[in-house]
Amino acid sequence: MSWQEKINAALDARRAADALRRRYPVAQGAGRWLVADDRQYLNFSSNDYLGLSHHPQIIRAWQQGAEQFGVGSGGSGHVSGYSVAHQALEEELAEWLGYSRALLFISGFAANQAVIAAMMAKEDRIVADRLSHASLLEAASLSPSQLRRFVHNDVTHLARLLASPCPGQQLVVTEGVFSMDGDSAPLAEIQQVTQQHNGWLMVDDAHGTGVIGEQGRGSCWLQKVKPELLVVTFGKGFGVSGAAVLCSSTVADYLLQFARHLIYNTSMPPAQAQALRASLAVIRRDEGDARREKLVSLIARFRAGVQDLPFTLADSCSAIQPLIVGDNSRALQLAEKLRQQGCWVTAIRPPTVPAGTARLRLTLTAAHEMQDIDRLLEVLHGNG
């Protein structure tokens, strides 16, 4: 089989399964409205959970940062790309979340890959929730360490895996809020069993940070858990992009020496760091509380109105509200029907989710209004 035949076969298989991914060029993709092909849609696909991507103070902070620092960082943080803006953001994040140190990364994917690659050796073991994000599972699969997966949120199964002999160290990996189901991990129970077996806990709280807990401190703070490694990302609740790893001072020093994604990547622009500082300020103040409270009300309105639909509604109290349809083609058809009625919704299919669980991944944000939720419910009930 030639290269071209190999590529064609893979694409043909995706098409045959109604699983071929595609991109849509949009004129505006975050916030309440999505604009594509000169048409405006109510946007139920954005991860901009607090509606901060268009916040004027955050936009102005980025503009002022670009005027002060330029539009790029100029290099790796180990060379010339670590600015006073990066330093200030790291210090503010560490203070906010109660850690000694924070290290910035260009993306959550990079942060997860970097930590696992740097921390794990052949004699070690990673024990990961089966539904962990692709960045975590890919990094674990590529690691020389052993990978074992526990049944989603099943602490008993986790304990059984941790109890089997391991010559090295054990790292338990999970998410705070799961990206495709919107449910939360029982972090207190997971931490307890991890500590009983002398392991470390790594939590990716991409979808909880900024959105839940006191001052938006996220899933771990809400459940009174402090993992050894906490990954937070800035493309969701913060409305920007990038990520950070929160950890002890010695672990931060270690990652600065051995995390290749940190050493060899160009740092995020200092202007971006300034925007993130402005976003953090909004998240922590009363305005952040008001946005979180509004989001909770919108979620409650949606869940109350969707109960009698012929789909499985995931057990989620988060901004992620999946309607599990099952069949790929049915999910695509329903997403298209919603778009025709002015609601932009994304169909998520295998391999992103398990076979037979294709779904509409609906996301609600504080930028929505109650009438937006009512319109979505009207269309879902076939009355659009």
Curated annotation (Swiss-Prot):
Enzyme Commission (EC) number: 2.3.1.47
Annotated protein name in UniProt: 8-amino-7-oxononanoate synthase
Quaternary structure and interacting proteins, as annotated: Homodimer.
The protein's role, per its UniProt record: Catalyzes the decarboxylative condensation of pimeloyl-[acyl-carrier protein] and L-alanine to produce 8-amino-7-oxononanoate (AON), [acyl-carrier protein], and carbon dioxide.
Pathway of action: Cofactor biosynthesis; biotin biosynthesis
Keyword Ribonucleoprotein attached: no
Required co-factors: pyridoxal 5'-phosphate
Recorded family membership: Belongs to the class-II pyridoxal-phosphate-dependent aminotransferase family. BioF subfamily.
Disulfide bond residue pairs: none
Keywords per UniProt: Biotin biosynthesis, Pyridoxal phosphate, Transferase
Molecular function as annotated in GO: 8-amino-7-oxononanoate synthase activity; pyridoxal phosphate binding
Catalytic function, reaction form: 6-carboxyhexanoyl-[ACP] + L-alanine + H(+) = (8S)-8-amino-7-oxononanoate + holo-[ACP] + CO2
Superkingdom of the organism of origin: Bacteria
Residues that coordinate or bind pyridoxal 5'-phosphate: G108, F109, S179, H207, T233
GO biological process: biotin biosynthetic process
Residues modified as N6-(pyridoxal phosphate)lysine: K236
Pfam families: Aminotran_1_2 (PF00155)
Sites where the protein binds substrate: R21, H133, T352
InterPro entries, sorted: Aminotrans_II_pyridoxalP_BS (IPR001917), Aminotransferase_I/II_large (IPR004839), AON_synthase_class-II (IPR050087), AONS_Archaea/Proteobacteria (IPR004723), AONS_Proteobacteria (IPR022834), PyrdxlP-dep_Trfase (IPR015424), PyrdxlP-dep_Trfase_major (IPR015421), PyrdxlP-dep_Trfase_small (IPR015422)
